[in-house]
């Protein structure tokens, strides 16, 4: 009897071990499976909400109702009221819509052409409808040719009005087809170099990044005179800090040189010797990260001025409840002169001001770094990286790339 009991116990233990082993194998297999992905955002580990149209995330990950895939805001979440708790039913969490691809799919022929070039090891450089060159376009930095097209709505640029403004995209494969997601704005300073915010490219694979020059309407697919160039190298400031946006600046080295002309030209960079008065009219130029429904995402220009530091600090403190907030010394704030401004502007967009001594010549004074506003609740100043504080950093990397620093300054020494 004792012998039979021992056998029974051993048999039971063996069954338990077998069950545990099967469970371990199943869990291992599940762990190796990739999470479901929509856009560039993994959704498998998040709770679904809004009839599967969104997921529950922390409030600082949700900008204007949509997942923020670029970066996070600097300011801690404000104190919440009972009314702020939604169907996620967790303090500090909210239902946020999943990101969508901002650019329509390219035609099958265009996709095949790009894929063939990449398979051959080449970089993608596309220029659509051929148009004659402009013999009178200025080879000076920061200058534009005469613009005759008129914008349909206030706040929209004319095509090629700011030819140094570029759009940065991330490419991904979806069901065997290439899709591009708009990430950020950027500014051309050399035919091989683009300045943008570090948050736009931090931890990004350079092989997935492309810039488009000569763009106007991001919803229009291909446009005449548009150039698309792959990114060959990312240079992120070594001191960049994600949480505080300290040194939020990066250089993109392009795989091929841009064809400069009416649709694509570089901006000037100012050092501290270039002084802009408090009443200098400037523009924030770029696209919206969250365009309004049933509207095209065309390039915008927002009339702006540099805001006093005290005023900027006060509005951000009031808006966020972060009463110990201090503006970084390498940052500036802008104030908008128009009553109607789009809710969300893309990081990396340029803040350009006209030269005080050379009318018609524009300098890149700031790079859009972050914003803390909630459009329907309050208005606060946007924060920009102050470009003159980074001229030495830019010059050093430009020299390392065997390029000339005079190219983004008035009266370039050489144009080769």
UniProtKB/Swiss-Prot annotation:
Q: Where is the composition biased (Basic and acidic residues)?
A: 146-155
* Assembly mode: Interacts with mature TEP1 and to a lesser extent with full-length TEP1; the interaction is induced by microbial infection.
From the UniProt record, list the coiled-coil ranges. none
Give any single GO term for biological process. Answer: defense response to bacterium
Query: Which family does the record assign?
Result: Belongs to the peptidase S1 family. CLIP subfamily.
**Occurrences of domain Peptidase S1 (ranges):** 147-399
Q: Where in the cell is it found?
A: Secreted
Q: Cite the entry's keywords alphabetically.
A: Disulfide bond, Glycoprotein, Immunity, Innate immunity, Secreted, Serine protease homolog, Signal
Q: Which residues are glycosylated?
A: 294, 400
Q: Which Gene3D superfamilies match?
A: Trypsin-like serine proteases
GO cellular component terms, alphabetically, are: extracellular region; extracellular space
What protein name does the entry list?
A: Inactive CLIP domain-containing serine protease A30
Q: Which GO MF terms are attached to this record?
A: serine-type endopeptidase activity
Q: Where is the signal peptide?
A: 1-39
SUPFAM superfamilies recorded: Trypsin-like serine proteases
Q: Which domain of life is it from?
A: Eukaryota
Comp. bias regions, Acidic residues:
106-116
Q: Which InterPro entries match?
A: Peptidase_S1_PA (IPR009003), Peptidase_S1_PA_chymotrypsin (IPR043504), PPAF-2-like_Clip (IPR041515), Ser/Thr_Proteases_Immune/Dev (IPR051487), Trypsin_dom (IPR001254)
Task: Describe its function.
Answer: Probable inactive serine protease which plays an essential role in the innate immune response against bacteria and protozoa infection by activating the melanization cascade. Binds to the surface of parasite P.berghei ookinetes and bacterium E.coli where it promotes the accumulation of mature TEP1 which leads to the melanization of the microbe.
Q: Report residue spans for region: Disordered.
A: 100-155
Organism field: Anopheles gambiae (African malaria mosquito)
Domain annotation text?
The clip domain consists of 35-55 residues which are 'knitted' together usually by 3 conserved disulfide bonds forming a clip-like compact structure.
- Domain Clip: where? 48-97
């Amino acid at each position: 009897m004792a012998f039979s009991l021992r056998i029974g116990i051993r048999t039971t233990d063996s069954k338990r071990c077998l069950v545990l082993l099967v469970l371990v194998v199943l869990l291992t297999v599940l762990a190796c499976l990739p999470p479901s992905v929509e856009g560039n955002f993994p959704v498998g580990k998040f709770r679904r909400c809004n009839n599967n149209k969104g997921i529950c995330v922390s409030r600082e990950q949700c900008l204007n109702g949509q997942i923020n895939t670029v970066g996070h805001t600097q300011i801690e979440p404000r104190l919440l009221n009972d009314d702020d708790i939604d169907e996620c039913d967790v303090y500090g969490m909210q239902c946020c819509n999943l990101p969508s691809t901002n650019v329509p799919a390219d035609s099958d022929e265009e996709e095949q052409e790009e894929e063939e070039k990449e398979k051959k090891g080449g970089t993608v450089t596309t220029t659509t409808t051929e148009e004659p060159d402009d013999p009178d376009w200025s080879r000076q930095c920061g200058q534009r040719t005469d613009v005759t097209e008129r914008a349909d709505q206030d706040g929209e640029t004319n095509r090629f009005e700011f030819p140094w403004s570029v759009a940065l995209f991330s490419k991904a494969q979806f069901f065997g087809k290439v899709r591009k997601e708009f990430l950020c704005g950027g500014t051309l300073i050399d035919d091989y170099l683009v300045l943008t915010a570090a948050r736009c490219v931090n931890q990004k694979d350079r092989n997935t990044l492309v810039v488009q020059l000569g763009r106007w309407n991001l919803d229009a697919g291909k446009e005449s005179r548009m150039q698309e160039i792959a990114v060959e190298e990312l240079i992120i400031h070594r001191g960049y800090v994600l949480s505080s946006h300290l040194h939020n600046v990066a250089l993109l080295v392009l795989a091929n040189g841009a064809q400069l002309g009416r649709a694509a030209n570089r901006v000037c960079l100012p050092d501290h010797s270039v002084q802009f008065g408090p009443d200098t009219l400037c523009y924030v130029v770029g696209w919206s990260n969250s365009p309004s429904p049933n509207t095209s995402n065309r390039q915008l220009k927002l009339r702006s001025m540099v805001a006093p530091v005290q005023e900027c600090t006060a509005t951000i403190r009031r808006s966020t409840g972060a009463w110990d907030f201090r503006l970084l010394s390498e940052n500036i704030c802008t104030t908008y002169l128009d009553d109607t401004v789009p809710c969300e502007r893309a990081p990396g967009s340029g803040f350009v001001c006209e030269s005080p001594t050379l009318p018609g010549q524009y300098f890149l004074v700031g790079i859009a770094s972050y914003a803390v506003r909630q459009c329907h609740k309050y208005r606060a100043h946007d924060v920009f990286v102050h470009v003159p504080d980074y001229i030495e950093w830019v010059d050093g990397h430009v020299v390392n790339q065997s390029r000339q620093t005079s190219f983004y300054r008035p009266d370039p020494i050489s144009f080769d």
